[in-house]
């Protein structure tokens, strides 16, 4: 792991974060999306997309088609291990199936609180309201969650690909075809272009769930 990945935020930032930490805690029972059949007035289903391997337990989330190589990990860590990944789907013939939220099943116990994942560079100088939160941009309309080792392995893999062809990009020359292939293999709750993928970086045991 390089120096940038292990650098902790400044003490001033950490103090501000501690003072507003409870405001940023989610008050919604997110686990209900994976245990109930109806949320609000909408029927929901649960889609299993395999598991994710966290070899270090230092994890990140981002739009994988835009920021996979540059995203900083969360300050919060979890025990290293391999965990199931589930998607809460809102099926709709009228609007198309929508993915409401994602769950990495770290424990079979019911969560007692939800803490917002933070990377340590968020702007905490402005007043934070009860419903405010920090997150990542979804310029390409997708998300992922993975271990920081997966990011490192992907960067090395992609550097080798770029040596062969410097004009390629991750979406058009990798994920586009993989998403379409996965949609053909697992068409439930997917459009033909593909709405989720669980891809392992070649020659590693690190995988990347995309949704």
Which ranges hold each PLM region?
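Intrinsically disordered, low-complexity acidic regions enriched in Pro/Ser/Thr
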Residues: 2-211
């Amino acid at each position: 792991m390089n120096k940038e990945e292990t650098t902790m935020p400044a003490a001033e930032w950490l103090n501000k974060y501690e003072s507003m930490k409870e405001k940023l805690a989610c008050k919604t029972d997110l686990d209900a999306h994976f245990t109930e059949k109806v949320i609000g007035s909408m029927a929901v289903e649960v889609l299993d997309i395999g598991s994710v391997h966290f070899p270090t337990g230092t994890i990140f989330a981002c739009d994988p088609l835009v920021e996979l190589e540059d995203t900083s990990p969360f300050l919060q860590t979890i025990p290293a291990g391999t965990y199931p990944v589930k998607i809460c789907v809102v099926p709709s013939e009228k609007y198309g199936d929508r993915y409401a939220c994602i769950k990495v099943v770290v424990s079979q116990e019911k969560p007692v609180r939800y803490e917002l994942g933070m990377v340590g560079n968020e702007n905490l100088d402005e007043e934070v309201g009860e419903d405010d939160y920090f997150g990542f941009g979804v310029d390409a309309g997708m998300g992922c969650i993975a271990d920081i080792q997966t990011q490192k392995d992907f960067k090395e893999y992609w550097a080798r690909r770029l040596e062969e062809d410097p004009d390629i990009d991750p979406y058009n020359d990798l994920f586009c075809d993989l998403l379409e292939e996965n949609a053909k293999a697992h068409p439930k709750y997917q459009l033909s272009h593909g709405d989720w993928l669980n891809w392992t970086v070649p020659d590693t045991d690190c995988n990347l769930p995309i949704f």
